[in-house]
């Protein structure tokens, strides 16, 4: 993996900097590094592909070295270099694709394709190493079973979940009270509602709670908490729990009271925030507990009182809600997030070449399925293929 990254980094630099008109002295170190890559690769043969519709390709390396000059690089010099660069880039691209479509239930962090296994040999260690990538750094740590740490922007840590629970229900579905939520990606939206606006509740107040367990521990998280759940702020028709009928939800939004958010790790409270909105932080946690109240307004203008009558029919439904969004966090496990395309890169290659479903990943690389059942085997394989995807993205967009 180190060699593959170093190859890709050298090729990217060469493609960007070995251009016509450049002073040789400005790229002499890069050309020496480029020549060392050629010397190391010459005389070797590789084979990639042969899984799904990914074609088998054979690769042979026999390239001349780039020479020295006292002047600027001319068109002939650059053309010679380009022919070599293009072949090497094509090779790295195919090695990456070959690796991204393979998986193993045991030691999935290790190279799985024949070509990458061969590149792991001692003879290729002479290629100049550059391990500045966060992915390659963490791959090395994971390969040695040491603690890793990935920084994510809007991490996709919550499996998709959209549902409701009813604390009070009637066959006619005309006087309901309960909670509905939508968890997806890095965001939780939860709403508590009461058709009667807590008229018969103790102290005219309804209490709601929403608990979300994460599949992996997050640390040093920056979080946004808002006293609203915009996805539940408009009328909708909702299927009943048994699917036999539907019921009408027509929300009127109130501000939640006594809002509290707790971040827990192994059942122990790490951070607690009460009635604090905007930006908050959490040190480390694997569970989020949100609690909030719907309080019937003690004083109402006639217009508001008309919305919340003392008896049925209840045509408008009192609703309070919260939005919690993880803006950034550190996780020991690799995740998909908003700032990278690794999941899309891997998935698109597997789809394009009709790669059969293997023993580790779910069909279509379904992220909700993958993160819901995030086994150690999936974690190892995902870190490997994301690392390879990050290497490929240096050369192929």
From Swiss-Prot:
Protein residues bound to Ca(2+): 266, 286
Annotated Zn(2+) binding sites: 153
A Pfam family the protein falls into: Rota_Capsid_VP6
Post-translational modifications reported in the UniProt record: The N-terminus is blocked.
Any GO CC annotation of this UniProt entry: viral intermediate capsid
GO BP field: fusion of virus membrane with host plasma membrane
Location(s), subcellular: Virion
Main location: virion
Gene3D superfamilies to which the protein is assigned, alphabetical: 2.60.120.170, Viral capsid alpha domain (1.10.1350.10)
Source taxon at top rank: Viruses
Keywords: Calcium, Capsid protein, Intermediate capsid protein, Metal-binding, Ubl conjugation, Virion, Zinc
Region entry Interaction with the inner capsid protein VP2, spans: 62-73
Note: The VP6 trimer contains a zinc ion located at the center of the molecule. The zinc ion is not essential for either trimerization or transcription activity of the DLP. Zinc-depleted VP6 has an increased sensitivity to proteases.
Family: Belongs to the rotavirus VP6 family.
Function: Intermediate capsid protein that self assembles to form an icosahedral capsid with a T=13 symmetry, which consists of 230 trimers of VP6, with channels at each of its five-fold vertices. This capsid constitutes the middle concentric layer of the viral mature particle. The innermost VP2 capsid and the intermediate VP6 capsid remain intact following cell entry to protect the dsRNA from degradation and to prevent unfavorable antiviral responses in the host cell during all the replication cycle of the virus.
Subunit structure: Homotrimer. Interacts with the inner capsid protein VP2. Interacts with the outer capsid glycoprotein VP7. Interacts with the outer capsid protein VP5*.
UniProt-recorded name of the protein: Intermediate capsid protein VP6
Taxonomic path: Viruses, Riboviria, Orthornavirae, Duplornaviricota, Resentoviricetes
């Amino acid at each position: 993996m180190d060699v593959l990254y170093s190859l890709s980094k050298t090729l990217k630099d060469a493609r960007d900097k070995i251009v016509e008109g450049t002073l040789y002295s400005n790229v002499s170190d890069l050309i020496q590094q480029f020549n060392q890559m050629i010397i190391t690769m010459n005389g070797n043969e590789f084979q990639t592909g042969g899984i799904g519709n990914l074609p088998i390709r054979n690769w042979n390396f026999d390239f001349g070295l780039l020479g020295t000059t006292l002047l600027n690089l001319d068109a002939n010099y650059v053309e010679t270099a380009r022919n070599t660069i293009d072949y090497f880039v094509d090779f790295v691209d195919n090695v990456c694709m070959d690796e991204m479509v393979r998986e193993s239930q045991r030691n999935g962090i290790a190279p799985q394709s024949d070509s990458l296994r061969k590149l792991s040999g001692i003879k290729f260690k002479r290629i100049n190493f550059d391990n500045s990538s966060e992915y390659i750094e963490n791959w090395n740590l994971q390969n040695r079973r040491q603690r890793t740490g990935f920084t994510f922007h809007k991490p996709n840590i919550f499996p998709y979940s959209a549902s409701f629970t009813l604390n009070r229900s009637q066959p006619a579905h005309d006087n309901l009270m309960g909670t509905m939520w939508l968890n997806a990606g890095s965001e939780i939206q939860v709403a508590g509602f009461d058709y009667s606006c807590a008229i018969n509740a103790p102290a005219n107040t309804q209490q709601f709670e929403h608990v979300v367990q994460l599949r992996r521990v997050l640390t040093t998280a920056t979080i946004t908490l808002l006293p609203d759940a915009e996805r539940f702020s408009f009328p909708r028709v909702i299927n009943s729990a048994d699917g036999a009928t539907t019921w009408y939800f027509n929300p009127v939004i109130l501000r939640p009271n006594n809002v509290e958010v707790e971040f827990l790790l192994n059942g122990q409270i790490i951070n607690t925030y009460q009635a604090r909105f905007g930006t908050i932080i959490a040190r480390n946690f694997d569970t989020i507990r949100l609690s909030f109240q719907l309080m019937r307004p003690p004083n109402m203008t006639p217009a508001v009182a008309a919305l919340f009558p003392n008896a049925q029919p209840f045509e408008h439904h009192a609703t309070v809600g919260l939005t919690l969004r993880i803006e950034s966090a550190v996780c020991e496990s690799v995740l998909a997030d908003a700032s990278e395309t690794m999941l899309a890169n891997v998935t698109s290659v597997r789809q394009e070449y009709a790669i059969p479903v293997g023993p580790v990943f779910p069909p279509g690389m379904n992220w909700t399925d993958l993160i819901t059942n995030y086994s150690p085997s999936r974690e190892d394989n995902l870190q490997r293929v994301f690392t390879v995807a990050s290497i490929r993205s240096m050369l192929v967009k």
